[in-house]
Amino acid sequence: TYSDASGASENSTRWGVDKPLYKDLIGRTKAALKKNPKNVLFAVVWMQGEFDFGGTPVNHAAQFGALVDKFRADLADMAGQCVGGSAGGVPWICGDTTYFWKQKNESTYQTVYGSYKNKTE
């Protein structure tokens, strides 16, 4: 669950457009930018965990792309505080937090994590 006062709850394990973790991400980002007009968003660091291991990896790239697009659209009104003066120009740096996937199911790992590699949009 999500509330403006406390952010995403501890049991919020799902990410995606308009999910509790997304609302927390956009809410905290906007709060940080509003706190000081001199604050600038230089990048978003996305750490891919293992929760998606049991999901539908073929849908991951499209769902992640939709999340990034929504984030950038939701920050459009704060473009002046984004690197390069555009929310669309804020890079997403993607990493992973576990090698469990790679050891247990290389193809699932490559489907999900591999979709981040060499993306420039």
Language-model regions: role of each:
Residues T1-E121:
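Cell-envelope and extracellular/periplasmic
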